[in-house]
C-alpha cells in the first residue's frame, strides 16, 4: 500500500510525475529450430495486442485511472505494442457537455499520464535458448500511484526475471509556496511487493534516495528445469543433456539479471 505523507494543501494541481518501468523476461529452452519457432508463435499468440490491452486496462482500474484513448498494434513477424492514455479525472462526453466543462486536468494530462507495453520475443541461433521480454511503463501525473499495479503486472506475465525502476520528478507547491518533490513515503520498491511475490524471488536494490530514484532487480529463487523446457520433459533427457541445458539456462538468467555478458 502506498502511504502518503501528511495531507498537504496545494496551490493548484499536484504536478508530480511518477514513472514505473518494468523489463520482464521469460526464459525457455527449445531443442530444435522448429521448436524455437513454435515457442515464438506461442508467445506471440499468448501476448498479442488484445491480451496486452486487457492487462493494461486492468492496470488502469487498479491504480484508479480513467482511460482516455487506446492504441494497439500487432507486428509481423512477431511482437506487439499497446499505449493507453489515462487521467485521474473522469472522462466527460463532449456530446453531453460543452467544451468549457471538460476538465483542464484531462487535457493537461493527455501527454503525461500513460501506460505502455512492448514485447520482444527472440531466440539464440545455435544454443536453443529462447526469451520473451516485455517492457512496461506506467507514468502518472497527480496523486495516482503506479506502484499499486506492481504485483498484478508481475503475476500477469511469465516473470522469470524482473527489472524495475521507479522515479518521481517535478514538484508540487503548497499554499505557503513551499515546493514538495515527493508526496509519499518510499525506501525501496520492495516494500510494495506482496509477501507471496517476495518469497519467490531473489531481490537486489540500487537506490538513489536524494534523487528519488529506486531500482530493484529480481529473479526466481527456485530452479525447476521442467518450467523452462518447451515441449519437453526433464525425465526424458539424459543426465548429461539435463546438466548442459541447466547450465545454459542459468547462465542466460544470470546475464539478463546483471545486464552484461559473463566471461567464458
From Swiss-Prot:
The modification Pyruvic acid (Ser) is found at residue 113. The keyword Ribonucleoprotein does not apply. Pfam families: AdoMet_dc (PF02675). One of its GO terms (biological process) is spermidine biosynthetic process. Signal peptide: none annotated. The record marks 112-113 as: Cleavage (non-hydrolytic). The active site is at 113 (schiff-base intermediate with substrate), 118 (proton acceptor), 141 (proton donor). Pathway: Amine and polyamine biosynthesis; S-adenosylmethioninamine biosynthesis; S-adenosylmethioninamine from S-adenosyl-L-methionine: step 1/1. It comes from Xanthomonas euvesicatoria pv. vesicatoria (strain 85-10). Its EC number is 4.1.1.50. One of its GO terms (molecular function) is adenosylmethionine decarboxylase activity. HAMAP family: AdoMetDC_2. Its cofactor is pyruvate. InterPro entries: AdoMetDC_fam_prok (IPR003826), S-AdoMet_deCO2ase_bac (IPR009165), S-AdoMet_deCO2ase_core (IPR016067). It comes from the Bacteria. Heterooctamer of four alpha and four beta chains arranged as a tetramer of alpha/beta heterodimers. Binds 1 pyruvoyl group covalently per subunit. One of its GO terms (cellular component) is cytosol. It catalyses: S-adenosyl-L-methionine + H(+) = S-adenosyl 3-(methylsulfanyl)propylamine + CO2. Catalyzes the decarboxylation of S-adenosylmethionine to S-adenosylmethioninamine (dcAdoMet), the propylamine donor required for the synthesis of the polyamines spermine and spermidine from the diamine putrescine. Is synthesized initially as an inactive proenzyme. Formation of the active enzyme involves a self-maturation process in which the active site pyruvoyl group is generated from an internal serine residue via an autocatalytic post-translational modification. Two non-identical subunits are generated from the proenzyme in this reaction, and the pyruvate is formed at the N-terminus of the alpha chain, which is derived from the carboxyl end of the proenzyme. The keyword Lipid metabolism does not apply. Belongs to the prokaryotic AdoMetDC family. Type 2 subfamily. This is S-adenosylmethionine decarboxylase proenzyme. The gene is speD. Keywords: Autocatalytic cleavage, Decarboxylase, Lyase, Polyamine biosynthesis, Pyruvate, S-adenosyl-L-methionine, Schiff base, Spermidine biosynthesis, Zymogen. It is an enzyme of class 4 (lyase).
Amino acid at each position: 500500500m502506498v502511504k502518503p505523507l501528511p495531507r498537504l494543501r496545494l496551490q493548484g494541481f499536484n504536478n508530480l510525475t511518477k514513472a514505473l518501468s518494468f523489463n520482464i523476461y521469460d526464459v525457455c529452452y527449445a531443442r530444435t529450430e522448429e521448436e524455437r519457432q513454435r515457442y515464438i508463435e506461442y508467445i506471440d499468440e499468448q501476448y498479442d495486442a488484445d491480451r496486452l490491452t486487457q492487462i493494461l486496462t486492468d492496470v488502469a482500474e487498479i491504480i484508479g485511472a480513467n482511460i482516455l484513448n487506446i492504441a494497439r498494434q500487432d507486428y509481423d513477424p512477431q511482437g506487439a505494442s499497446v499505449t493507453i492514455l489515462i487521467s485521474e479525472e473522469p472522462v466527460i462526453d463532449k456530446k453531453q457537455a460543452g467544451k468549457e466543462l471538460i476538465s483542464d486536468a484531462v487535457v493537461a494530462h493527455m501527454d503525461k499520464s500513460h501506460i505502455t507495453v512492448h514485447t520482444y520475443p527472440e531466440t539464440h541461433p545455435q544454443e536453443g535458448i529462447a526469451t520473451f521480454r516485455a517492457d512496461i511503463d506506467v507514468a502518472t501525473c497527480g496523486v495516482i500511484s503506479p506502484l499499486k499495479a506492481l504485483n498484478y503486472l508481475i503475476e500477469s506475465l511469465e516473470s522469470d526475471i524482473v527489472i524495475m525502476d521507479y522515479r518521481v520528478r517535478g514538484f508540487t507547491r503548497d499554499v505557503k509556496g513551499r515546493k514538495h518533490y515527493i508526496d509519499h513515503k518510499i525506501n525501496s520498491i520492495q516494500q510494495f511487493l506482496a509477501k507471496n511475490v517476495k518469497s519467490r524471488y531473489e531481490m537486489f536494490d540500487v537506490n538513489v534516495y536524494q534523487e528519488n530514484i529506486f531500482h530493484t532487480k529480481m529473479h526466481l529463487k527456485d530452479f525447476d528445469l521442467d518450467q523452462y523446457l518447451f515441449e519437453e520433459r526433464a525425465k526424458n533427457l539424459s543426465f548429461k543433456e539435463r546438466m548442459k541445458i541447466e547450465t545454459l539456462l542459468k547462465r542466460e538468467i544470470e546475464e539478463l539479471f546483471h545486464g552484461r555478458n559473463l566471461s567464458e
